[in-house]
Amino acid sequence: MGHVNNAVYLTYCEMARIRYWSEVTGEPLAAGHHGAESLILAEARITYRAQVFHTDVVTVETRATHIGRSSFLLEHRLTACEPGGEPRLVAISESVMVRFDYTVGRAARLDDRFVAAMESFEGRRLREA
């Protein structure tokens, strides 16, 4: 065998979305006040294209493609290569993230400053009108 378990691909995406959020917004993924609010994963979809082997170097390219009232969609493109080798596409994934207010137990509107940071980073409008 020598390949990683399929669940590991989702872990790669998790690490990528945590890094994306902190680099784009300057905030940790738990973006609420004293833990009352945070971003939660509402949905994850993945299409596997090829195996990832234990010795491979994996890269995840992440971008935001859509922002709603309380959620946003991230797309992930996963590539892998042997050290010194050519990258190959191994998976494509989408993650739906929702801002959740634990105090009231439901989704909360995304803060405009986070929307502005994501749109600035992506260089285009992402929020639906």
Locate predicted features.
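Hot-dog-fold acyl-thioester-processing enzymes
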Residues: 1-41, 101-129
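Charged, low-complexity, helix/coiled-coil-prone segments
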Residues: 1-5, 18-21, 53-66
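Short coil/loop residues immediately preceding or within conserved phosphate-binding loops
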Residues: 41-43, 73
